Each structure stands twice: as structure tokens, then as C-alpha cells.
Amino acid sequence: MKPEDFRASTQRPFTGEEYLKSLQDGREIYIYGERVKDVTTHPAFRNAAASVAQLYDALHKPEMQDSLCWNTDTGSGGYTHKFFRVAKSADDLRHERDAIAEWSRLSYGWMGRTPDYKAAFGCALGGTPGFYGQFEQNARNWYTRIQETGLYFNHAIVNPPIDRHLPTDKVKDVYIKLEKETDAGIIVSGAKVVATNSALTHYNMIGFGSAQVMGENPDFALMFVAPMDADGVKLISRASYEMVAGATGSPYDYPLSSRFDENDAILVMDNVLIPWENVLLYRDFDRCRRWTMEGGFARMYPLQACVRLAVKLDFITALLKKSLECTGTLEFRGVQADLGEVVAWRNTFWALSDSMCSEATPWVNGAYLPDHAALQTYRVLAPMAYAKIKNIIERNVTSGLIYLPSSARDLNNPQIDQYLAKYVRGSNGMDHVQRIKILKLMWDAIGSEFGGRHELYEINYSGSQDEIRLQCLRQAQSSGNMDKMMAMVDRCLSEYDQNGWTVPHLHNNDDINMLDKLLK
């Protein structure tokens, strides 16, 4: 049974309830040494699953449909989330940007690998299906399925960080590779990382990162779609921040960890049969190497990523202001200056998202892609911004981040609460319950294990720090922007030499130069 078969209507995406039912498929997920029977009810995953379900439900709310949805282009007569359909103009991209933002606000920007993230992959398939050669029809079919149903995809494109100094063939027992070809499809084995939130997705796209070394053995040159319930597909999950929050605290203590934890996992494939209809590239080094630059996904996903980060920074900016109100330092000049810098970073990413849309460029088959320069700028600046903002919070909120009781339970103990009311109250009349609530939210955002993972996530979101900078340089060179900048400097250099100005509109200084007179 396909995931989309759980829908009561074929002319719309999943509802939240249908999405949750579609995950109850016997998938092989492991955490804390045990296999998970049902990710929708297991305390390590259930609130994250419910948070994703909330996104699907929003697609069917009359008050949100205009901002989130439009008609499909597949002939189904139905509707879909706007970012699931190939943009045909800059204005389309602007509408898609706004839909991404609306969805992201439901998780306050804290869920990054929501279904719209990999919708960019679906649109890449629909925009240039011919790129996939003999598997062109597969690309078309997947675009249709993803768009019409709102299928939840993730990807696993990074090889495990084992012996990276060795050639690929020397680590062939680790990396995903072809085991054999059959009439039904290909059989593959190996592992990929980091499969973020894949426990809650329908499918995983298996491919390559832009900086990945592929080696020379074509058995590694594969790209395909793996169902999460396929025999032999296994996820080994990291510790669940959601489960830890539930076991040791309450929503008051961990308001983000307890519902927005996108669990990262090791994806293992043990002799998995991938049907031919799921194969996109097969033993094809040429296309695997060209996919990042020509496949479209690398030009599409940064729009979702940048908007999601901008929403997150809206939240963090306001939360920082509230935190400073708690401590009574908001009116200090230096503190306000730092808050202003956070606002500037927030403005930067919204402005970049504007530029991605307004400066969009035609691609192929009538499709449009976000502006390349803006998206490359986002990829370089995002890690810098997040680390700087976290540092600003730590320097300004200081001990307020940990000057907190251990649990909401302390507030329910009259012997302790009387002291908390006096010594842990907020400033300007704020009571202790509200102060603790605000600062526990801030701690969960930046200081808890959940918060630490988010810093790591934002810093490494787009991959190698060197590579994203090199790609920014290459874009400037290939677009002609570097040539224009160089030409401007060359023009400046040509306007003078060791003897003076070489352009007719400027006056040489022979008549006023004092050195000429002094040295005679």
C-alpha cells in the first residue's frame, strides 16, 4: 500500500490524521536498543509527528488555503502546497516564499526538514526530467506523486565519516553501492548520514552531496528513492530530546525540545530491493557529478532554507527582547546595540529571500529558479549569523540563562515557591512564573541539547564551509559579476599613472605641487 492511498480524496494532500496513519507501516526504526513499533505513538517521536501532522492539517483550513495552496499542474484537478509545484515566474516564487513562511511559523522556524524542504527535489524532477536520461519518466512520475499528495521526502546524501582520506573503493563495505541487478530492480547495501527526521518521512532520496568524492567504481554512482518501509531499510536514531524532555521535565521546562525534535539517524540499507520505477540514475558517474549544478535542487532548496531561518530569527529576536526585559537590561545602550545587530541579521535573510524571488532567472521548460547570487550569499552568511547571534544572547542574557529552578515542579512546592517568587522574579513587576517560563524557553533554544544541536545544524546546513565559499566565488566568476568588478578596478587604475591623470576631465597638479618648487 502506497502512503498516498491513505487519503480519502485523490484531489488533495494528506490531512494530519491520514499522514499519521501512513507512517504505521512497520518501518524498522531503532532507538535505545529497541525497535519502535509505531513512531506516531512512541514517546521519542510522537510530538514531532503530531507537529508535522499540524502542517498537513493547515493545508485544509479555509483561512489558510489562500496563503498555502494553489491548484496542481498535473491535471488532477486538485490543490497542493505552493512550493510543491514548479514556479513559472518570479511572482510564482514570491507566492511560494510566502507559503513556506506561513508553514514555518507553525513551528516557529524550529523544524527545518518539513515536507516543503524536499518539495524542492520534487520540483527539480518536474522542471528538468530529461536530465535523468533513460529514467526520465520516473522523474515525471515522482514529480506528479509528490505534488498531488504532499509526500514527505527526506534525503541521505552524505557518506559516513569513516576513512575519508582513503579512495572510495577502500571503504566499499560502508558506502551505499550496487550489490546486483535484477528484473525487479537493483539491490543495494551500505549506509548514509545524516537522515534527519527520516523516521517520520515516507521516502528517502539517496544521492550525493556537492563536495563528495565518488571514486571510480560505477557501482557507487546511483541515485534512487527508497521507501522507508522497504525490507532492509533501517534507521538507528540518536538520543531523543523529545523523550528526555518528557521523562525529566514538562512543556514548561522544554517547550521546543518536547515537540520539534527532528531526530537525526544513521540510515542503513541491507540488501534492499529498489524497484526500477524508483531509480533515477544508475551507474552514471557523469550525471551524478553534474546533478548538483544541473539537477535544480541545489538552486531550489535554499529558498525554503533561507525563509525558514528568517522565521526562526523573527522568533529568536523577539525572545531575546523578552529575555532582556526579564533581567532589566533592555534600556542599556550596549544591550540595545546588540539587539539591533540581531535585528539586522534577521533583516538580512528576509532581504535575501526577497532577492531570490525578485531576481529569479528562467531555467528550462518554462521553470524559474531563485537568484543564484542571493542563495549563495545565504549559504555563506547563515552559519556566521547563527553563531554570532548565539554569542550575543549569551553575552547579554548571561546568568539569566541558568539562574533557573530545575523544574516546573519547584513552582508547585510551597516551601520553594515562596523563595522563587521573591528571588527569581522578573523586572518591572514581572512575576517569577513568567520570568522562568521565558528564560527556560530561551535556554531550550540555545543552551539545551536541542539548542546545541540546532547550532550544529545551522553551521553545517549547506555542507563544507570551504565548499560553500568556493561556490559563491565560482558563481561570481561564471555569472560575469567578477569580470564586471575587475573591469571597474581596471578602469580606476587606467585613469592615472606615475606621471599623473590620464583622463581629460581631471586637472594635474603641476601648478600647485609644492615638492616641485622645494626640490628645484
From Swiss-Prot:
<dbReference type="InterPro" id="IPR012688">
    <property type="entry name" value="HpaB_gammaproteobact"/>
</dbReference>
<comment type="subunit">
    <text>4-HPA 3-monooxygenase consists of a reductase component HpaC and an oxygenase component HpaB.</text>
</comment>
<dbReference type="InterPro" id="IPR024674">
    <property type="entry name" value="HpaB/PvcC/4-BUDH_N"/>
</dbReference>
<keyword id="KW-0285">Flavoprotein</keyword>
<dbReference type="Pfam" id="PF03241">
    <property type="entry name" value="HpaB"/>
</dbReference>
<dbReference type="InterPro" id="IPR024677">
    <property type="entry name" value="HpaB/PvcC"/>
</dbReference>
<protein>
    <recommendedName>
        <fullName>4-hydroxyphenylacetate 3-monooxygenase oxygenase component</fullName>
        <ecNumber>1.14.14.9</ecNumber>
    </recommendedName>
</protein>
<dbReference type="GO" id="GO:0010124">
    <property type="term" value="P:phenylacetate catabolic process"/>
</dbReference>
<dbReference type="GO" id="GO:0052881">
    <property type="term" value="F:4-hydroxyphenylacetate 3-monooxygenase activity"/>
</dbReference>
<keyword id="KW-0560">Oxidoreductase</keyword>
<keyword id="KW-0503">Monooxygenase</keyword>
<dbReference type="InterPro" id="IPR036250">
    <property type="entry name" value="AcylCo_DH-like_C"/>
</dbReference>
<dbReference type="InterPro" id="IPR009100">
    <property type="entry name" value="AcylCoA_DH/oxidase_NM_dom_sf"/>
</dbReference>
<dbReference type="GO" id="GO:0016627">
    <property type="term" value="F:oxidoreductase activity, acting on the CH-CH group of donors"/>
</dbReference>
<dbReference type="InterPro" id="IPR046373">
    <property type="entry name" value="Acyl-CoA_Oxase/DH_mid-dom_sf"/>
</dbReference>
<dbReference type="GO" id="GO:0050660">
    <property type="term" value="F:flavin adenine dinucleotide binding"/>
</dbReference>
<dbReference type="InterPro" id="IPR004925">
    <property type="entry name" value="HpaB/PvcC/4-BUDH"/>
</dbReference>
<comment type="similarity">
    <text>Belongs to the FADH(2)-utilizing monooxygenase family.</text>
</comment>
<keyword id="KW-0058">Aromatic hydrocarbons catabolism</keyword>
<dbReference type="InterPro" id="IPR024719">
    <property type="entry name" value="HpaB/PvcC/4-BUDH_C"/>
</dbReference>
<comment type="function">
    <text>Utilizes FADH(2) supplied by HpaC or by another flavin reductase, to catalyze the hydroxylation of 4-hydroxyphenylacetic acid, leading to the production of 3,4-DHPA. Can also oxidize phenol to catechol, and hydroxylate other phenol derivatives.</text>
</comment>
<dbReference type="Pfam" id="PF11794">
    <property type="entry name" value="HpaB_N"/>
</dbReference>
<comment type="pathway">
    <text>Aromatic compound metabolism; 4-hydroxyphenylacetate degradation; pyruvate and succinate semialdehyde from 4-hydroxyphenylacetate: step 1/7.</text>
</comment>
<keyword id="KW-0274">FAD</keyword>
